[in-house]
Structures are given as structure tokens and as C-alpha cells.
Amino acid sequence: AGIYGPGRGPFAKVRKGTARRIIKQGQVFSRIHVEDIAQALELSLAKPQPGAIYNLCDDDPAPPQDVIGHAAALLGLPLPPAVNFDEAEMTPMARSFYAESKKVRNDRIKQALGWAPQFPTYRAGLAALLAQDS
């Protein structure tokens, strides 16, 4: 899952006017707020289950263009331009990031440790980040 939190998210690019909404049909990514990672680590230390592997993510895998669009809306800025993935100028590393969807589920950690993300959607997480910035 893509990690976001203070200093790491879409707001800087949207504010600078360099954000783009890369459109690739069917593309979704799972994300997780850094505070949710910390909470999961605390729970796993309190309830150790040696050998257990957990996927950490929020409950709402979403297309990257939706996240950029929502960040712009929260900032009251215009929607960044949409660019088709096939036509987008990107570094090879950035292009490889978009090569496939990166969607995972968090059911196991919820059941085993009683974990629930404080920010179950990117919308909740971005709103909290913006409130922290203010």
C-alpha cells in the first residue's frame, strides 16, 4: 500500500500546480496513513503472533486520479489536468509504478488484532492532513 502522512501526500504538487491526474482504466491502489501503520505496530507488539504477516491498508482502494482530484477540492483549487497513461510523460520508475494495480486487503489484521484504521479512506486521511497543516 502507498504510505502517506505529514509531508508525504498529494497536497504539495497540487499547490504547486504540477499535479496531474494520470488516467489508466481499472487502475486502483491501496493506501495507508502513517498513523495507522504506527497503531498496527503497537497492536502487533501488544498481541504478538510470531510468523503472522499482515497487509496494512485502508478500506478504500481507489484510482490515483481520484486522490489528486479530492486533494484539489479540499484545497479549493482547480482540478489538475487529466492525462492518459499511454500519453503521459514519466520516468521509467514512475511508469513502472503504474504498471499494475496495487490492491490489498486488511481483513487478517482486523480479525487477528482487532485493528481498524483511524483513516479508513484516503478522503478521511487527506482531510486530517489538511487540518494538521492549518
Q: What are the roles of these predicted feature ranges?
A:
Residues 3-13, 21-45, 52:
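Substrate-positioning beta->alpha
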Residues 120-134:
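Amphipathic terminal alpha-helices
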Residues 35, 65, 107, 120-123:
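Residues in well-ordered alpha-helical elements
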Residues 38-94:
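Mid/C-terminal beta-alpha module of Rossmann-like enzyme folds, strongest
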